[in-house]
Amino acid sequence: MSVAPIQDSVLLTLDISPLKMTDQQFYEFCRRNQDFRFEIDGTGSLIVTSPGGLETSKRNSEINFQLRLWAEKGKIGLAFECRGMFTLPNGARRSPDAFWILKDRYYALSKEEREERFARIVPDFVIELRSKSDNLRKLQNKMGEYIENGVRLGWLIDPYERRVHIYRADESVEVLENPQKISGEDILSGFELDLTEIW
């Protein structure tokens, strides 16, 4: 097992691929180490991140509030926050800052599948919010992984540069400079995220 310390919000990355943790083992590992946030990438490496600061928490709360409010009005999909984790087709277990899944896709899973700790479902839409210590290149790679695994729309919001990187299913990436609002396009028809509280 190799350890690679990194100077950002990722405290370290552990190559645990030889261990092949089951969902139950990974859940138990997360439960016993609640001061940290864990994900497993597509190569099987365990990514350990530190908690964000208050400003990041405030921004994340605002993003989740707006997404949930819209989702409840529209009733075609469900909004989730970062405590929810799912398993992508490449085996990565991810928990973006916010994500949204069409209701018919979510309820196509059995009750048992929905109650699994790391359900095997690809969100239709994800948001990652950059914190001050996040490495931008690593977040961009993560967004690429989402799209490669079937996410239809993704936003990487960078409040420090006041930029939004928009990732689409055709693998195109658009960067908006200091937008005040961003549209959910045809994936989240009618949804606009007001960024004035984020900047």
Language model: regions and residue ranges:
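Gly/Pro/Ser/Thr-rich low-complexity, intrinsically disordered segments predominantly at protein N-termini
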Residues: 1-199
